[in-house]
Amino acid sequence: MNQASLYQHANQVQRHDAKLILDEFASTMQWRSDGEDALLDVGSGSGNVLMDFVKPLLPIRGQLVGTDISSQMVHYASKHYQREERTRFQVLDIGCERLPEELSGRFDHVTSFYCLHWVQNLKGALGNIYNLLKPEGGDCLLAFLASNPVYEVYKILKTNDKWSTFMQDVENFISPLHYSLSPGEEFSQLLNDVGFVQHNVEIRNEVFVYEGVRTLKDNVKAICPFLERMPADLHEQFLDDFIDIVISMNLQQGENNEDQKFLSPYKLVVAYARKTPEFVNNVFLEPTHQNLVKGIN
């Protein structure tokens, strides 16, 4: 997912969900009384979600660090937002074995939207998030996909000889919670395992509607990891096959291009956790050490 400019203009789902979640949790986050909060964002991509929705929440003296595993994304964001004060971008693989020393234990807050489903070693990533927070405490707000129809589409495309060469490692690009029968409980346990004893985990059932074939194709082009592996003259064929599978899954509404819509029902993990032992009880609807899990029957 390295097409930064395309992603900047085709991440409607990410923007929609990030704004709703930040609006909901802004008053819950533990903001410093001196206004000198340091916040690191994991998986900032092109930077527009971070700058449009996260930065406005920071106190005026707050420091912001946006990170991404893609150097191209970091370069794009650094250039696009170079005039922003108290803001910088740098490369970071949140699944790395050892955090860069200059980042470890330096932050009051960590946020991450639509990134952790790319990380197969979730426990390692959560351990790094825990260690990014200051020793005296801090909090994190995380949102990522537990499941999405796109993963099933990828698996079907891989069975096609035309695309299989480019998709041998398809499982590496499927959320580690996609096959889980209890993603909320599983993620909650991972948080406990790395030290986040106090946390709230929800699984939200959502549906996003893509208006028209071109809108859906543009979104796929922005996030699909396989397109950059194949010749450019095959991209449109791949996207056409993608759309055909979506239609076969009964996720289409409308019969012609003018009123065609595509439904994307997905499960979203939303988690808030604090590193400190002190906890505000009214954050939760359940007693301490119990986690609220919505959308799981």
Swiss-Prot record:
Tissue spec. comment: Predominantly expressed in corpora allata. Also expressed at low level in testis.
Keyword Iron-sulfur carried by entry: no
Keywords: Methyltransferase, Transferase
Cleaved signal peptide residues: none
Positions in coiled-coil regions: none
Catalytic activity of the protein: (2E,6E)-farnesoate + S-adenosyl-L-methionine = methyl (2E,6E)-farnesoate + S-adenosyl-L-homocysteine; juvenile hormone III carboxylate + S-adenosyl-L-methionine = juvenile hormone III + S-adenosyl-L-homocysteine
Stored SUPFAM superfamilies: S-adenosyl-L-methionine-dependent methyltransferases
InterPro entries according to UniProt: Methyltransf_12, SAM-dependent_MTases_sf
Disulfide bond annotation, renumbered to this chain: none
One GO term (biological process): methylation
Database matches in Pfam families: Methyltransf_12
GO MF term list: farnesoic acid O-methyltransferase activity; methyltransferase activity
EC number(s) given by UniProt: 2.1.1.325
Gene3D superfamilies: Vaccinia Virus protein VP39
Highest taxon listed in the record's lineage: Eukaryota
Family affiliation: Belongs to the methyltransferase superfamily.
Known role: O-methyltransferase that transfers a methyl group from S-adenosyl-L-methionine (SAM) to the carboxyl group of juvenile hormone acids to produce active juvenile hormones in the corpora allata, the last step during juvenile hormone biosynthesis. Also able to methylate farnesoate to methyl farnesoate.
Protein name from the UniProt record: Juvenile hormone acid O-methyltransferase
Organism per entry: Drosophila melanogaster
